[in-house]
């Protein structure tokens, strides 16, 4: 006996079959990472087109799998370097997306920004006392990475499925700037004073979070 489905049910099935699907069961691996000696990662990325295609969804799945594993304390389990954020071009997708998941001052911050734009930056500067690291930079570069004390950034947040605006300071603010730099083809060591890597100004805000030394 043939069962006739309602038109609404058939339409739902068609949508499921047609729309690209995101795989949220990926296991992170360091083989995903693109290092800083690759030409493309040193170049500006391109805007993401909507609706997202399968390549964009695959990138989102990888970014979330990698950083969430780090956040959950499973980096050693998967043999990866822990990170609090990752940009799309760090896993070989040359588009404007990044994902952050971290704790800062006892508050959990989590966002996956697509086509982010900086709309304001503080005049005063800031830096992490521990310095910065990067998943795509195997060689450590000693020195203070000078950034802005606060940042206001806007973009489409995939997690909330809407345009959002974030104003952030502290570790979260530093991480937003770090990941945005990646989308411009820049690395943290480009912001270290080449003549005096440990140079500081007494007016600059010092951030001293509890972070693994190799975390991005």
Swiss-Prot record:
GO MF, one annotated term: metal ion binding
Gene Ontology biological process terms in this record: co-translational protein modification; translation
CDD domains in UniProt: Pep_deformylase
List of catalytic residues: 179
HAMAP family: Pep_deformylase
Enzyme nomenclature, EC number: 3.5.1.88
Identification of the protein by name: Peptide deformylase
Binding site for Fe cation: 134, 178, 182
Function text: Removes the formyl group from the N-terminal Met of newly synthesized proteins. Requires at least a dipeptide for an efficient rate of reaction. N-terminal L-methionine is a prerequisite for activity but the enzyme has broad specificity at other positions.
């Amino acid at each position: 006996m043939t069962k006739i489905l309602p038109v609404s049910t058939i339409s739902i099935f068609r949508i499921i079959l047609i729309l690209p699907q995101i795989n949220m069961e990926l296991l992170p691996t360091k083989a995903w990472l693109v290092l800083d000696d690759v030409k493309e990662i040193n170049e500006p990325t391109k805007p993401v087109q909507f609706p997202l295609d399968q390549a964009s969804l695959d990138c989102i799945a990888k970014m979330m799998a990698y950083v969430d594993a780090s956040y959950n304390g499973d980096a050693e389990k998967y043999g990866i370097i822990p990170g609090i954020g990752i940009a799309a071009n760090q896993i070989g997708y040359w588009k404007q997306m990044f994902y952050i998941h971290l704790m800062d001052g006892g508050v959990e911050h989590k966002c996956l920004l697509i086509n982010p734009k900086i709309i304001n930056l503080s005049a005063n500067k800031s830096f992490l006392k521990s310095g910065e690291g990067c998943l795509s930079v195997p060689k450590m570069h000693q020195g203070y990475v000078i950034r802005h004390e606060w940042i206001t950034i806007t973009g489409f947040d995939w997690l909330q499925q809407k345009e959002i605006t974030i104003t952030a300071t502290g570790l979260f603010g530093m991480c937003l700037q770090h990941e945005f730099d990646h989308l411009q083809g820049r690395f943290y060591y480009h912001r270290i004073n080449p003549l005096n890597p440990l140079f500081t100004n007494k007016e600059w805000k010092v951030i001293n979070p509890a972070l693994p030394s190799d975390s991005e």
